[in-house]
Every structure is written in C-alpha cells, then in structure tokens.
C-alpha cells in the first residue's frame, strides 16, 4: 500500500497539497501516482506568475510508461517551481512528498481546501 501522509490534502487525480509556513501551498503527485507512472524522465512545470483555476491542467509528468497531466488542486498563482526537476526528474519517484515537489502556489480561494480529500478518503479512493 502506498504511503499517504495524514497532514496533506489530496485530489482524486493524485495531486497532494501541503500548506507551508509562509502561507503558500506546495503541490506534488502522490506516491501512488508515481508508482503507476514508473520512472520519470521529464517534468513540464508551469511558469511562475501563471494563474490557474482549481482543476486546470498546469503541468505534465512524463515517465517511461506515459505522459500524465497534473491538475491545479487549488486556484491561484504559481510562485515557485522545483527547478531541480529539470535535471533530476527522478526526485518525483524517490521523494514524492519531499524533494520531488513540483510547484508552489499562492491560493486565491482557501475555501477550496474543503473540496480536497483527507488521507483516509484518498486511501479509500486508491484502494477501489
């Protein structure tokens, strides 16, 4: 069974969200998603300054098996991307909740957090 940290929120499309000390939100893909995709070969990240609505496709993870769209879990502005992934996309595989984060955003509607899954609900969703 995949690791699903309790302190994170999730989308059923396998993105996770973590609130940072500065009020921004880090976003990545779940361990379950990276296991399904296999070894990452490239991650196409959004541009800093771009604005997305919740559910918009904003990035692409390319693995040896497939390319998969990554969706914005919250509406907001991209304020940082994990530039280390350009040369080390495998970080998404080795540390999906750590060094493999994809981008950070400034949420425009924190009320959208209520639409995300908690760890228990996400575990139930991926077990089906």
From Swiss-Prot:
> What name does the UniProt record give this protein?
Glycine cleavage system H protein
Residues recorded as bearing N6-lipoyllysine in the entry: 65
Q: Does the keyword tRNA processing apply?
A: no
The record's listing under InterPro entries reads: Biotin_lipoyl (IPR000089), GCV_H (IPR002930), GCV_H/Fam206 (IPR033753), GCV_H_sub (IPR017453), Single_hybrid_motif (IPR011053)
Under the heading Pfam families, the entry gives:
GCV_H
Q: Which cellular component terms (GO) are annotated to the entry?
A: cytosol; glycine cleavage complex
Superkingdom, taxonomy of origin: Bacteria
Keyword Repressor included in the entry's annotation = no
Q: Name one GO biological process term.
A: glycine decarboxylation via glycine cleavage system
Alphabetically sorted, this entry's keywords are: Lipoyl
PROSITE patterns the UniProt entry points to: BIOTINYL_LIPOYL
Family per similarity comment: Belongs to the GcvH family.
CDD domains from the entry?
GCS_H (cd06848)
Its needed co-factors are: (R)-lipoate
Q: What does this protein do?
A: The glycine cleavage system catalyzes the degradation of glycine. The H protein shuttles the methylamine group of glycine from the P protein to the T protein.
Species whose genome carries this gene: Erwinia tasmaniensis (strain DSM 17950 / CFBP 7177 / CIP 109463 / NCPPB 4357 / Et1/99)
Q: What binding details are noted for the cofactor?
A: Binds 1 lipoyl cofactor covalently.
Subunit note? The glycine cleavage system is composed of four proteins: P, T, L and H.
Where do the Lipoyl-binding domain residues begin and end?
24-106
